């Protein structure tokens, strides 16, 4: 019943601003209305909070590490932690074989190079710790020398096949707090660590997990 009258011509840029304002004002109203809401908006899952972690393992010949954002404490008596890993990652195979892993909690001072080191190359073909100073926990696995605020050594107690991913349900065999810096969240990474792309005239792909940007028409076979 309410209406707004605009008595002068509206420029294109102003029209777009008005449309954007209208969309913003209506967004919450529509989402709460059962007859108007999009009830299959799976971007709602993006609102789940995630930390970012480096999971380290060893295949018997070399150390390996990968970035994950799916680490969850399940219980506290006994302590149980779940770690989900994509089956296509080499670390999934290694941890299935060995049954042990370390979870390194990245802190907010971790630079983008950490994500390049552990997220943009495969441990099948690259030694991710070559030339690095390393520390080892009681289980013999690496924990990072910097850019973490804590780490946990885990022993796999149960494996759950989730199709594309595997869930490792683990007991905690060792846990250390390194410092009091805040844990790196996925949101913090997106807003403060990930380089902002220059997209004009370029084609590429953006990883929905870590934000890595690959420029090109097709993805290489070794990028998951």
Task: Map each language-model feature to its residues.
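Basic, polyanion-binding surface patches
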Residues: 31-203, 214
């Amino acid at each position: 019943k309410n209406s707004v009258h605009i008595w002068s011509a509206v420029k294109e840029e102003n029209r777009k601003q008005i449309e954007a304002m209208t969309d913003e004002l209506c967004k919450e109203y529509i989402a709460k209305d059962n007859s108007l809401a999009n009830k299959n908006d799976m971007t709602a899952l993006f609102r789940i909070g995630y930390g970012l972690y480096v999971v380290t393992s060893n295949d018997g010949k070399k150390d390996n590490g990968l970035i994950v954002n799916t680490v969850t404490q399940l219980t506290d008596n006994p302590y149980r932690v779940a770690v989900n890993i994509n089956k296509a990652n080499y670390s999934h195979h290694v941890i299935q074989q060995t049954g042990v892993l370390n979870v390194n909690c990245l802190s907010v001072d971790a630079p983008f190079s950490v994500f390049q080191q552990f997220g943009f190359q495969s441990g099948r073909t690259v030694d991710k710790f070559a030339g690095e100073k390393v520390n080892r926990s009681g289980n013999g696995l690496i924990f990072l020398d910097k850019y973490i605020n804590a780490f946990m050594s885990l022993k796999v107690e149960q494996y759950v096949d989730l199709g594309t991913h595997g869930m490792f349900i683990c007991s905690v065999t060792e846990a250390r707090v390194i410092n009091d810096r805040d844990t790196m969240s996925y949101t913090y990474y997106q807003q403060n660590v990930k380089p902002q792309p220059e997209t004009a005239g370029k084609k590429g792909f953006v990883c929905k997990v870590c934000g890595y940007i690959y420029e090109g028409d097709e993805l290489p076979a070794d990028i998951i």
